[in-house]
Amino acid sequence: MIKIGIIGSGNWSLALSKVLISPEVTIKARNIDKAKKKFPKNKKFFIIDNFEILKDFDVLFLANPSQSLRGILNEIPKNTKSKFVICSKGIEKKTNKLMSEVLTEFFPKNNFAILSGPNFSFEVIKGLPTATVISSKNSNLSKYISKIIVQEKFRTYFNNDIIGTQIGGAMKNVIAIASGFIIGKGLGL
């Protein structure tokens, strides 16, 4: 069985846990008690606070806030062979680096993909139909990640433009807020 880990215990982690095909998912959380209350009982969740356990996982989904990614990557064992899926959207404030650039500082040889909307965690949690992009320079990795995601209401598309995908993901909320403002003011689109 494939070993899947999700680092982070926020709403995006909950959303991911609902669309992953594995009956068992390990969640790395800072607050174990809070995480246990959040995740559904229909899957077998292992909620941990130790990064060392994750070194032998097949896939690690990084679903933490973008500004905390560097600190989290620093705690993951350097000998991990895991494939990474970056779900964090944003640009690191201190360095102006994309999340993939931060990841490759720590794990330059590991395969990685970017998972990015256009979607919102609440849509996925509610089971609403939505789509996402899996972006990787390695098309086989994109296909592999797609196969571990339930496709019924969470459709995946592929591309190899990791930079464009990350910029789009970082700008998504800004555009959504601006669009909401324009609509709210009756200014049209």
Describe the residue ranges of each PLM region.
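Short, charged/polar "capping" segments at the starts of alpha-helices
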Residues: 32-38, 93-95, 141-142
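Glycine-rich beta-alpha junction loops
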Residues: 32, 89-91, 116-120, 138, ...
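Internal alpha-helical scaffold of NAD(P)-dependent oxidoreductase catalytic cores
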Residues: 42, 68, 79, 102-111, ...
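NAD(P)+-binding Rossmann beta1-loop-alpha1 motif at the extreme N-terminus of oxidoreductases
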Residues: 1-49, 55, 59
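Rossmann-like NAD(P)(H) cofactor-binding subdomain of soluble oxidoreductases
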Residues: 13-16, 50-54, 58-128, 145
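A structural micro-motif
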Residues: 2, 23, 45, 82, ...
